[in-house]
Regions:
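Histidine-dependent nucleotide/RNA phosphoesterase domain, centered on the 2H-phosphoesterase fold
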Residues: 1-160
Length: 160
């Protein structure tokens, strides 16, 4: 079982490469980049990834499962948690790139406005093509992720 080799094989499968219109939004206590509109290509890529890499996933501990169950999950999300180790996959997947840690409610609006203004000022920030996958590792819940591998996605060739 070689995760890096599987990442490269997965990325080499020709597919429609997703592109999203990014937007800065508040997600619960965090602020994140999200897709302004649904992307079937991105949803398919995410679903394919969940299934392709599930064999590398560490099973949830009873404590981790209990914490997730306390979040008010739907029946489908509980089934996803038990089968895939995470409740927000497939129909419940929502693309996001978290920009902040938790922000108190009284500050969240002003931080959101600031980040939206900064983001809007970036030239070319209104289309975000997804062309690479990164393999990240987090050694402990409280530590940052670090990149341990990357692979370029392979686009479906247009008929000539």
């Amino acid at each position: 079982m070689d995760l890096t080799a599987d990442l490269e094989r997965f990325a080499a499968i020709p597919r429609t490469l997703p592109a999203i219109e990014p937007a800065i939004r508040s997600l619960a206590r965090f602020i994140a980049v999200v897709a302004a509109a649904p992307s079937m290509a991105l949803d398919r890529l995410a679903a394919d990834g969940v299934m392709a890499f599930d064999r590398f996933r560490r099973p949830l501990t009873a404590h981790e499962r209990g914490q997730r169950l306390g979040a008010g999950l739907s029946q489908r999300q509980i089934e996803n948690l038990d089968r895939w180790g995470y409740p927000y996959v497939f129909e419940d997947f929502r693309f996001h790139l978290t920009l902040t840690g938790p922000i108190d409610a009284d500050r969240r609006g002003s931080v959101l406005a600031l980040l939206q203004a900064r983001f809007d000022a970036i030239d070319g920030a209104h289309s975000l093509p997804i062309t690479r996958l990164s393999l990240l590792r987090q050694d402990a819940w409280s530590t940052p992720f670090r990149v341990v591998g990357q692979a370029a996605l392979t686009a479906v060739r247009s008929p000539q």
